[in-house]
């Protein structure tokens, strides 16, 4: 009798196991040279010789490490989306992402962002759900000058994209919130100072997202690594460690490691978690290269063991979990701060602003004596340090710019990605559609708005990658081309319902074969929200109702 040999484990490109040979084009690109080195070529060659001089491997690969993607060529609908059409879809202009770690900016930095937009980006500026600012229509010839101006106010595009540590999310009210367990600003600044733009973590298997906050206002459950404020019964204020979150086409919620980390050790523990990902993360398939897949295969117990024994060389302290929140904390409206002054949070529709608006906000801040503004993980902005006597004038000035501190349910709770306007991956219009959808919903649902005592979030994404977090929205829309009923296709969306973070965190319920066209979004939202109001129990949240609702009420 012959005994079968055990199958040989497949090479997943894990460095710690000796698998260093590149297994795909992206890994080959990184092995050929540190992507960060492309900055010198941008400054000394491409900016001087123009777009046509750019090497394709730099253009479609290494430029990402400096926050640069080519934007979508105008005039191509969703039927053109896909790698086969990249040469047609690739415009000679760039999206530039400016990282704003912790979302924190001075008035001077905000003014500089506004000036860059009006001078170099055709007055475009969008606040992303990762506290970044994104420009469009950037020409490579202007990139060095933009970098110089950003550097003058302490901002950068370094590793804003690419297989590296992206912007670190932080609380918009860090250091000033009356509800925070502690202020982790030091840890965010220290991580950026020690590790961003350095070779240690410039070659990770895939993107790597971090959130650090003294309260639960950074969507920590969908980050690769997160530290969330919690009080330990013996050791006092510290942070609870989470790992393995992420959405896209295979969404997973982060899991608690079960460890309490004192503030002073956060940068060290962050670097250790990042090192585990760098060394053990899967590099064979891009679609399975995020940390969440390693966590899924290993489990938390093994991950913690490797983290402690191989990297930290010491055990972590066991700690309690923070109590989950019922609703997103978006900091919209007026809030009292620790320093006795006020914060004013406003809601541009789907994060869309402009250089003109950002400059005008900087002017309003100057008149109110404020030098601090924060972007939020929900595409909002918050101005800090406003005295009571100047509050009404500031709010009136913001209202005049279309930035409402008392927004409707729909203006406050709708998010969208860049969409087909600029993104080469998108099948559908999203952010532009949102500008029309919000006023439509405000008008159509005016008669029942007073009955909505819970938020209903609406997230619109142009493709399956979920930059706008469709799976954790009450109502999520995933862009795709759908059958128009006449043998052709039209821009539309797959519907996800009932996603939620915090208490009862989970992903949306995808309705079988239910899709809506872009033109039908208002009709669909009107219908399902009215069904919710009609059939909900007292105090029931939308996500709770969706679980038990009849499918006909969700269509």
UniProtKB/Swiss-Prot annotation:
UniProt keyword Iron present: yes
GO cellular component, one term: cytosol
Residue span of region Disordered: 1-22
Coiled coil location: none
Example of a GO MF term: heme binding
CC cofactor note: Binds 1 siroheme per subunit. Binds 1 [4Fe-4S] cluster per subunit.
Cofactor(s) needed by this chain: siroheme; [4Fe-4S] cluster
The reaction(s) this protein catalyses: hydrogen sulfide + 6 oxidized [2Fe-2S]-[ferredoxin] + 3 H2O = sulfite + 6 reduced [2Fe-2S]-[ferredoxin] + 7 H(+)
Covalent cross-link (3'-(S-cysteinyl)-tyrosine (Tyr-Cys)), residues: 69-161
Binding site residues for [4Fe-4S] cluster: 417, 423, 463, 467
Leading EC class: oxidoreductase
Pfam families referenced in this protein's UniProt entry, alphabetically: NIR_SIR (PF01077), NIR_SIR_ferr (PF03460)
UniProtKB keywords: 4Fe-4S, Heme, Iron, Iron-sulfur, Metal-binding, Oxidoreductase, Thioether bond
Enzyme Commission no: 1.8.7.1
Binding site for siroheme: 467
Xref: InterPro entries: NIR_SIR_4Fe-4S, NiRdtase/SiRdtase_haem-b_fer, Nit/Sulf_reduc_fer-like_dom_sf, NO2/SO3_Rdtase_4Fe4S_dom, NO2/SO3_Rdtase_4Fe4S_sf, NO2/SO3_Rdtase_FeS/sirohaem_BS
Domain of life: Bacteria
GO biological process: sulfate assimilation
Known partners and oligomeric status: Monomer.
Functional description taken from the UniProt entry: Catalyzes the reduction of sulfite to sulfide, a step in the biosynthesis of sulfur-containing amino acids and cofactors.
Family named by the database record: Belongs to the nitrite and sulfite reductase 4Fe-4S domain family.
Protein name in UniProt: Sulfite reductase [ferredoxin]
Organism field: Mycobacterium tuberculosis (strain ATCC 25618 / H37Rv)
Lineage of producing organism: Bacteria, Bacillati, Actinomycetota, Actinomycetes, Mycobacteriales
The encoding gene: sir
């Amino acid at each position: 009798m012959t005994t079968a040999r055990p199958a040989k484990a497949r090479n997943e490109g894990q460095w710690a196991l000796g698998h260093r040979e590149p297994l795909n084009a992206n890994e080959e690109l990184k092995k050929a040279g540190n992507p960060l080195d492309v900055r010198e070529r941008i400054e000394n060659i491409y900016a001087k010789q123009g777009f046509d001089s750019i090497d394709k491997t730099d253009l479609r690969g290494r430029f990402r490490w400096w926050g640069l993607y080519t934007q979508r060529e105008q005039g191509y609908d969703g039927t053109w989306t896909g790698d086969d059409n990249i040469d047609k879809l690739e415009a000679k202009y760039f999206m530039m992402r400016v990282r704003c770690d912790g979302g924190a900016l001075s008035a001077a930095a905000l003014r500089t962002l506004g000036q860059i937009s009006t001078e170099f980006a055709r007055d475009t500026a969008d606040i992303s759900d990762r506290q970044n600012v994104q420009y469009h229509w950037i020409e490579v010839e202007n990139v060095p000058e933009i970098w110089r101006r950003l550097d003058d106010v302490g901002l950068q595009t370094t590793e804003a994209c690419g297989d590296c540590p992206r912007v670190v999310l932080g609380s918009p009210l860090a250091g000033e919130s009356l509800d925070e367990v502690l202020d982790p600003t030091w840890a965010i600044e220290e991580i950026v100072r020690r590790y961003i733009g350095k070779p240690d973590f410039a070659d990770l298997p895939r993107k790597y997202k971090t959130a650090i906050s003294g309260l639960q206002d950074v969507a920590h459950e969908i980050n690769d690594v997160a530290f969330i404020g919690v009080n330990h019964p013996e050791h006092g204020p510290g942070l609870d460690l989470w790992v393995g979150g992420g959405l896209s086409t295979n969404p997973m919620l982060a899991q608690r490691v079960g460890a309490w980390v004192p503030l002073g050790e956060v940068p060290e523990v962050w670097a250790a978690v990042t090192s585990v990902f760098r060394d053990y993360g899967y590099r064979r398939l891009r679609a399975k290269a995020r940390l969440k897949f390693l966590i899924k295969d290993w489990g938390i117990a093994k991950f913690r063991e490797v983290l402690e024994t191989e990297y930290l060389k010491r055990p972590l302290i066991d700690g309690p979990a923070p109590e989950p929140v019922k609703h997103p904390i978006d900091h919209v409206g007026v809030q009292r701060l620790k320093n006795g002054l006020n914060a004013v949070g406003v809601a541009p529709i789907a994060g869309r602003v402009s250089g003109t608006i950002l400059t005008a906000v900087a002017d309003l801040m100057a008149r109110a004596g404020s030098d601090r503004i924060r972007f939020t993980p929900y595409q909002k902005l918050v101005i800090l340090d406003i005295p009571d006597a100047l509050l009404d004038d500031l709010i009136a000035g913001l209202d005049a710019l279309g930035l409402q501190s008392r927004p409707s349910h729909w203006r406050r709770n709708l998010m969208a990605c860049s969409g087909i306007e600029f993104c080469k991956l998108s099948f559908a219009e999203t952010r532009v559609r949102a500008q029309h959808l919000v006023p439509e919903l405000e008008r159509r649902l005016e008669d029942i708005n007073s009955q909505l005592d819970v938020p209903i979030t609406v997230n619109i994404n142009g493709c399956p990658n979920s930059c706008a977090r469709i799976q954790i929205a009450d109502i999520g829309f995933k862009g795709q081309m759908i059958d128009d009923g006449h043998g052709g296709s039209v821009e539309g969306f797959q519907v996800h319902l009932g996603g939620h973070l915090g208490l009862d965190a989970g992903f949306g319920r995808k309705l079988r074969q239910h899709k809506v066209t872009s033109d039908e979004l208002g009709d669909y939202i009107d219908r399902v929200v009215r069904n919710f109001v009609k059939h909900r129990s007292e105090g029931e949240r939308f996500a709770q109702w969706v679980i038990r609702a009849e499918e006909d009420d969700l269509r």
